[in-house]
Amino acid sequence: MTTTVDPHAALRDRVYRTLFDGPGESDPALRRTVAENGAVPPDLAAVVDKIHRHAYKVTDEDIARLRASYSDDQLFEIVVSAAVGASRIRLAAGLAALESA
């Protein structure tokens, strides 16, 4: 088995640090938890889960409900964090599969 060196790991890690730990309108801890599909506030749980599992199922109504509690900037950061987190999980699974092949 050959160990694959990921030439893009450093750049990806920089993007993750900026997105999850950088300044923003939403709390960095919330962005990180959303990315990990962890225990988010109840009002976010359904949308975050949809983004992680079936992003195409998120509706305008889902977002409209969240606008009562979150600004557009906060919602943008939350949605992007969930999407990047979901892709990160899938990438890790894919790289692990390649390593074990």
Residues of each region from the PLM?
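Hydrophobic alpha-helical segments
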Residues: 1-101
